[in-house]
Protein backbone atom coordinates (compact mmCIF):
# COMPACT_ATOMS: atom_id res chain seq x y z
CA UNK A 1 0.00 0.00 0.00
CA UNK A 2 1.39 3.41 -1.00
CA UNK A 3 2.05 6.24 1.42
CA UNK A 4 0.27 9.56 1.01
CA UNK A 5 2.53 12.61 0.59
CA UNK A 6 1.76 15.83 2.49
CA UNK A 7 3.72 19.07 2.41
CA UNK A 8 4.19 21.44 5.34
CA UNK A 9 3.01 24.98 4.59
CA UNK A 10 6.59 26.28 4.74
CA UNK A 11 7.65 24.04 1.83
CA UNK A 12 5.83 26.33 -0.61
CA UNK A 13 8.31 29.12 0.16
CA UNK A 14 11.21 26.65 -0.14
CA UNK A 15 10.08 25.72 -3.67
CA UNK A 16 9.96 29.39 -4.75
CA UNK A 17 13.73 29.65 -4.36
CA UNK A 18 14.39 26.62 -6.60
CA UNK A 19 14.45 26.73 -10.38
CA UNK A 20 11.55 25.19 -12.31
CA UNK A 21 13.83 22.31 -13.33
CA UNK A 22 14.88 21.65 -9.72
CA UNK A 23 11.24 21.70 -8.58
CA UNK A 24 10.36 19.08 -11.19
CA UNK A 25 13.31 16.91 -10.16
CA UNK A 26 12.35 17.13 -6.47
CA UNK A 27 8.67 16.36 -7.07
CA UNK A 28 9.55 13.40 -9.28
CA UNK A 29 11.99 12.02 -6.69
CA UNK A 30 9.45 12.44 -3.89
CA UNK A 31 6.89 10.48 -5.90
CA UNK A 32 9.34 7.72 -6.84
CA UNK A 33 11.23 7.41 -3.56
CA UNK A 34 8.77 8.18 -0.77
CA UNK A 35 5.45 6.61 -1.77
CA UNK A 36 6.77 3.10 -1.04
CA UNK A 37 8.87 2.10 1.98
CA UNK A 38 9.97 5.63 3.02
CA UNK A 39 11.54 4.24 6.21
CA UNK A 40 13.86 1.85 4.37
CA UNK A 41 17.40 3.19 4.27
CA UNK A 42 18.79 3.30 0.71
CA UNK A 43 21.53 5.07 -1.19
CA UNK A 44 19.36 8.19 -1.41
CA UNK A 45 17.36 7.97 1.84
CA UNK A 46 18.81 7.94 5.31
CA UNK A 47 17.81 8.61 8.89
CA UNK A 48 19.52 11.66 10.35
CA UNK A 49 21.14 12.25 13.68
CA UNK A 50 19.05 14.52 15.91
CA UNK A 51 18.79 17.90 14.19
CA UNK A 52 16.42 20.89 14.04
CA UNK A 53 14.92 19.94 10.66
CA UNK A 54 13.59 16.37 10.34
CA UNK A 55 14.34 12.73 11.18
CA UNK A 56 14.82 11.59 7.52
CA UNK A 57 16.61 12.95 4.45
CA UNK A 58 16.16 12.20 0.74
CA UNK A 59 19.25 13.11 -1.32
CA UNK A 60 18.81 14.21 -4.93
CA UNK A 61 22.22 15.42 -6.08
CA UNK A 62 22.82 18.72 -4.24
CA UNK A 63 19.12 18.96 -3.32
CA UNK A 64 17.73 17.65 -0.04
CA UNK A 65 14.20 16.77 1.04
CA UNK A 66 13.67 16.49 4.79
CA UNK A 67 10.69 14.46 5.92
CA UNK A 68 8.98 12.52 8.69
CA UNK A 69 6.71 9.49 8.48
CA UNK A 70 3.47 9.06 10.42
CA UNK A 71 3.16 5.37 11.08
CA UNK A 72 0.14 3.32 11.90
CA UNK A 73 -2.91 3.22 9.69
CA UNK A 74 -2.57 6.74 8.26
CA UNK A 75 0.63 6.00 6.28
CA UNK A 76 1.58 9.60 5.59
CA UNK A 77 4.94 11.05 4.59
CA UNK A 78 5.13 14.71 5.60
CA UNK A 79 7.72 16.78 3.72
CA UNK A 80 9.02 19.40 6.17
CA UNK A 81 11.72 21.18 4.17
CA UNK A 82 13.41 21.29 0.76
CA UNK A 83 16.81 22.85 0.21
CA UNK A 84 20.21 22.81 -1.45
CA UNK A 85 23.22 21.41 0.38
CA UNK A 86 26.73 22.78 0.16
CA UNK A 87 29.26 21.05 2.43
CA UNK A 88 27.77 21.01 5.93
CA UNK A 89 25.24 23.79 5.30
CA UNK A 90 21.77 23.47 3.79
CA UNK A 91 20.04 26.50 2.30
CA UNK A 92 16.31 26.12 2.95
CA UNK A 93 14.33 28.93 1.40
CA UNK A 94 16.59 31.91 2.04
CA UNK A 95 17.83 30.62 5.40
CA UNK A 96 21.06 28.69 5.95
CA UNK A 97 20.99 25.79 8.40
CA UNK A 98 24.20 24.26 9.64
CA UNK A 99 24.08 20.48 10.06
Predicted segments — roles?
Residues 2, 16-17, 24, 28, ...:
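Enriched for short, Lys/Arg-rich terminal
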Residues 5, 46, 77:
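A broad, low-specificity signal marking well-ordered, structured residues that form hydrophobic/aromatic
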Residues 5-6, 57:
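Short aromatic/basic micro-patch
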Residues 15, 19, 38-41:
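Flexible interhelical turns and helix-capping residues at alpha-helix boundaries
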Residues 32-57:
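A short, surface-exposed loop/turn module that caps and links secondary-structure elements
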